[in-house]
Design a protein with these regions (language model features):
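Active-site loop segments of alpha/beta catalytic cores
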Residues: 1-31, 36-40, 51, 55, ...
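Alpha/beta catalytic barrel-like cores
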Residues: 24-30, 51-83
Length: 318
């Protein structure tokens, strides 16, 4: 069974010859975010023998719409318009993804990391400004979310149809319990979240939903429970929702993860024996069908690749 076949069968909750795995971290790109970054992705894949590549959007977190500099009040967000098809922000990410796809030569599935519109707006402004304006004029800020979603849709289309990605790894955030009630999130954020994800699903049936627990704050994860995606990844150790429990919670869909991604976790700090036992524990609890072994989120950039190889070797033996 090829890596691609293995992963796609896991997506479909079909039997596989062994459980697939996928891990990633933030790279240190060169100044132009060019070929060096592409090579880093391919080197990680080749060295560890993983079953998939998730291309990081390092260097493109901020949404660089020049209009943002003109915003001085919440009402100003009504003037935001999309950057459009020819934006370097979009073109350069598509080029990175295309080079990774070409470099892997069909050996595995490639997914590109795409953030939800609210997160891109938060990266492009600030936490404080976004939440302040959202309280002052939610309609204006929600208009901005919708505009950003149009640019993200353009990015998604080009990633899949031009770069050749198999799908996207869609990162949703901002549902922390301190930020919104579930009702508020569904009213303010859900529409733009789904505008992107549902569009991605018209282009590829193999998209991954990442329910991000990036800062260690629990989310109202129920707001994402019905988001349509082939596989789901969330922060097991932040949400206190095991891989087995999450598989039921997300309706029996393929689940991805299992390991704590933080430095205090077994993956980064444990012994080989401890990591191997954790692989056994996770799969005994969750099963081996519709499961992709990974982590809660990005792992530390200085992780010893040998630790990921231990996992792959253990899976080879099971």
């Amino acid at each position: 069974m090829t890596k691609k076949e293995r992963l796609l069968r896991a997506f479909q909750n079909q039997e596989v010859d062994k459980v697939p795995m996928g891990f990633w971290y933030h790279f240190s790109p060169d100044d132009d975010f060019g070929q060096k970054t592409v090579d880093q992705h391919l080197e990680l894949f080749r060295e560890t023998g993983m079953d998939m590549i998730k291309v990081m959007c390092d260097g493109y977190f901020n949404y660089p719409n020049p209009y943002i500099e003109k915003v001085t009040s919440a009402e100003d967000w009504f003037g935001l318009t999309p950057m459009g098809e020819d934006s370097p922000y979009i073109a350069n990410q598509v080029l990175r993804a295309k080079r990774v796809v070409e470099g892997v030569k069909g050996e595995c599935c490639v997914f590109y990391n795409v953030f939800c519109p609210m997160s891109l707006m938060r990266f492009g402004t600030s936490e404080e400004l976004l939440m302040k304006h959202l309280k002052e004029n939610p309609e204006a800020v929600c208009h901005a979310f919708e505009v950003i979603a149009e640019d993200v849709k353009t990015l998604v289309r080009k990633l899949i149809t031009e770069a050749g990605c198999d799908g996207i790894y869609y990162c949703v955030q901002n549902a922390e319990t301190f930020r919104f009630t579930a009702e508020e999130y569904r009213k303010l954020v859900r529409p733009s979240d789904l505008k992107v994800l549902e569009y991605a699903n018209t282009l590829s049936e193999n998209n991954i939903l990442h329910c991000c627990g990036w800062a260690g704050d629990p989310n109202r994860i129920e707001v994402w429970q019905d988001y349509p995606a082939k596989a789901v990844n969330w922060a097991v150790y932040v949400e206190n929702l095991s891989l087995a429990e999450g598989k039921k919670f997300f309706g029996g869909r393929c689940v991805m993860g299992g390991f704590d991604n933080r430095k205090e976790g077994l993956l980064y700090s444990g012994t080989k024996e401890e990591i191997e036992k954790e692989v056994e524990r996770i799969l005994k609890e969750t099963g081996t069908t519709g499961v992709i072994l990974g982590a809660d989120c990005t792992v530390p950039s200085d992780i010893d690749h040998q630790r990921l190889i231990w996992i792959r070797e253990k899976l080879d033996k099971m």
